[in-house]
Amino acid sequence: MSAIWGNISFDTEIDQSGCRNMRVLYETNCKLDHIYEYYDRKIYFGCGIQEIIRESVNENMPIAEDKNAIIFEADCIIDNREEIKQELGYSQGDIVPDGRLLYELYLKEKINFLTKIRGMYAIAIYDKNDDTLYLISDPISSRCLYYYRGTDGGICFSTLIRPITEFYKDIPFNSNYIKDFLVAPGLMPNITSDETPHKGIYKLNPGTYLVVTRESVEEREYFDIDKYIICNDYTNADVVSDTFKKLYAECVKDAVYTSGEVASSMSSGLDSATTSILAAQILDKKSKKLFSYTYVPENKMKNKGNKILDETVDVQKILDKYPNMKGHFVNNNGKCCIDDMNKVLEIMEIPIKAYVNFPNLCEIYEKAHKHGCKIVLTGQNGNSTVSHGYIDDVLCDLYIKKKYITFLRYLNSYCKTVKESRKAALKGCIRYFRHTKKVLSIAGKRKFEYEIDNRFISQNIMNDYPLEIRFVDNDITYVDNIPTIESEYKRFIKHQALYTYLGEFETKMGLKYGIVIRDPTADIRMISFCYHMPYRYFAYNGVPRWLIRSSFTREIPNEILNNWMRYGVQNADCYTRLRRDWKRLVVDINKQMQTVESDKRLCEYFDFEKINSFLSDNQKELDLKDEAAIDQLMYIYCVSKFYQLCKKS
């Protein structure tokens, strides 16, 4: 893998000091094994190499061969390298760097080479003959790439944002991005797929490439999930289950390819557990270990009903079953989740809402690197693919499609297993699904209405903020809490903003800690398999999350696999840690709010009367009865910290 950056000036010579500044930011903020550069007056390309796989030891980019008039670099791990090697005439045993393979494939196929690549990649190509720059993103933007068109007509691109803001120092904040962050509900920091907190700096969209000339910047789409079909046979349940497991294993096998050790960020959830189990089985055949890392509370916590607050026991059951899993239980040394806020913001370069999760992930990645791991597996996309399948989603879909016999059969089977009254369940389902049908039928027809749910946000934030246009244009629909039927599921799978955000997270964390984060549940083949699969199979015959439950009967301990009602709660002690350290934390939070109140750019966004009232009521001890209020305050705290960091840099 790599970090890539560069600048094309179509008219004037590029300032070499600006190029040096870009390089320095990568040297000081990323764990890179080598940095190579190419400079030729109006062209500058930089590339930092991470030696993750054996082929990357010989990687040397940018590639600039005068005979071809092409400057080429890529941030990539290619999963179908053997196919590409064969097409290019290499022997099976030849060790060829992935970047070199892509370069030669581009020379052979030109831009059509994108139809033959599978893996993680962001690519920059400059063609001297027609004075054109191509910037390319893979189908899910798993490697982020930013770009900025300067007022001088030049184009700057970079894996990280700061090298661009260092080269062009007067880029203003994008107020709409910050308002989106504060106004939209949920843990996503962004609602747009391509915008950033800096006006004019954009991210590449999934499955697209840019064509940049002196006159224009044009985005072209080359990937369409509707046309990308990995499986044509969903004949029956046995075929689906068997095909799914084989495909899942292939995705994991590709993900664990590395010259170093492999780690997994593991819980007892079905997605990360199965990813880890498959990885352990594959690595065991090579006499290698899987290093697993599980976050657990600092002090023991009792489960609340079906909610598992401490996953130590269940994870240990998995570890006991697979001797080559080397388990580690971590708790961030008992630190509070906002102690490392500045560090997280410096890595991510955007404000974040998942402030609870990030510090613990940083600890996992840092420890994995120290243990010699170059790949860290995750299953965070699993709820959209391998472990999708809440029973309500499939039952509602069958009901709305008028598949009443199948609906009743699934409902009866489910109720029998969980020992629930079928009569009561049927009555509740019909009432719930009729409501869902009504909500969906009027969605998009009713007048746009949206109430900001963050109590600390002032209505003044709506000034010069086209909320309706931004929500509608970016396909953000907030309706009642209803089941996800097939059409809504497919709409979600196509939602680009989620992919570009996850790409930012995985790319930047990987560069910071010297690893590559890979999620087999987000492999484009798995996304395609699930997207095109008949929806009923997600909870086939009334079995929630049927894909995993049907195909991992021997691999997952029965207490985990067959307990349909269990739900693991991650970071369960985050609020108790906040309360424990509140007397210390509230001092800084008060100072931060005073700073915000005096900042002309931010002060109009917030209701300081409510903020000060909350802080006054909780001055001595944090009341945990209203966790939503705590989160809402932390989002404001995060934005203010982000603004301060941007000022300093």
Predicted regions, residues:
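Short, well-ordered loop/turn and helix-capping segments at boundaries between secondary-structure elements
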Residues: 166, 170, 281, 285, ...
